[in-house]
């Protein structure tokens, strides 16, 4: 038969302290685990925050680049619109200038044609426009009481001697050579404007000066 020895109050206190210590150690272990888990979670959160910040930084950089690009495009479009408007205004101004020049050219041509008709009637001379500017071709009609006298002419526009002789002959027949020369010169101008290339031949460019012969020059008195 076992003998039961009752615990003393001291032993009970020691045992209670021991059990309390075990519970505290268990609680401490749990607390340490929770702290470790918290720190681990906190580190994960910090890393996630850093990753998010990096992404945000990249996005902000992209947004800034896109904004700068958009601003450049807007500026380019504004400059382009201004340039287009300026070009439009220049084109309108050029069209107006061309219109004015054409109108002036028509007026000048009409005036020249009227002058040609007047000189043609005054001198009784018809100039073949199709032959100009290479040749001076036509006919001068001298009105007479009984019959008219026809004086045809067909000369190279550069034939200064031939033109000079023709002018002297017409002058001897009381034809106003000055008006005759004006007629041929104006007809030459019209023909050159209608047919002249971008760079007219030298002989054509010299036609006008050749036709306007000075009857007082020594050459005019050789015949």
UniProtKB/Swiss-Prot annotation:
Native source species: Drosophila teissieri (Fruit fly)
Coiled coil: 51-119
Quaternary state and interactors: Component of the Ndc80 complex, which is composed of Ndc80, Nuf2 and Spc25.
Keywords: Cell cycle, Cell division, Centromere, Chromosome, Coiled coil, Kinetochore, Meiosis, Mitosis, Nucleus
Family: Belongs to the SPC25 family.
Domain of life the protein comes from: Eukaryota
Protein role: Acts as a component of the essential kinetochore-associated Ndc80 complex, which is required for chromosome segregation and spindle checkpoint activity during meiosis and mitosis. Required for kinetochore integrity and the organization of stable microtubule binding sites in the outer plate of the kinetochore. Participates in SAC signaling that responds specifically to disruptions in spindle microtubule dynamics. The NDC80 complex synergistically enhances the affinity of the SKA1 complex for microtubules and may allow the NDC80 complex to track depolymerizing microtubules.
GO biological process: cell division; meiotic metaphase chromosome alignment; meiotic spindle organization; mitotic metaphase chromosome alignment
Compartment(s) where it occurs, according to its Swiss-Prot or TrEMBL record: Nucleus; Chromosome, Centromere, Kinetochore
Gene Ontology annotations for the cellular component aspect, listed alphabetically: Ndc80 complex; nucleus
Protein's UniProt name: Kinetochore protein Spc25
């Amino acid at each position: 038969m076992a003998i039961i020895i009752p615990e003393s109050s001291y032993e009970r206190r020691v045992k209670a302290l021991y059990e309390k210590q075990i519970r505290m150690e268990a609680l401490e272990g749990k607390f340490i685990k929770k702290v470790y888990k918290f720190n681990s979670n906190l580190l994960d959160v910090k890393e996630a925050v850093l990753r998010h910040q990096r992404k945000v930084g990249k996005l902000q950089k992209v947004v800034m680049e896109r904004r700068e690009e958009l601003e450049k495009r807007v500026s380019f479009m504004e400059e382009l619109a201004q340039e287009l408007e300026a070009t439009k205004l220049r084109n309108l101004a050029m069209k107006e200038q061309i219109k004015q020049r054409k109108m002036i050219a028509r007026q000048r041509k009409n005036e020249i044609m009227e002058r040609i008709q007047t000189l043609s009637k005054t001198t009784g001379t018809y100039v073949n426009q199709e032959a100009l500017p290479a040749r001076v071709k036509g006919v001068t009609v001298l009105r007479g009481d009984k019959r008219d006298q026809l004086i045809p002419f067909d000369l190279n526009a550069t034939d200064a001697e031939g033109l000079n002789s023709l002018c002297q002959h017409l002058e001897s027949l009381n034809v106003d050579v000055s008006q005759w020369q004006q007629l041929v010169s104006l007809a030459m101008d019209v023909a050159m404007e209608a047919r002249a290339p971008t760079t007219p031949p030298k002989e054509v460019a010299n036609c006008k000066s050749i036709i306007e012969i000075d009857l007082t020059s020594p050459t005019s008195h050789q015949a």
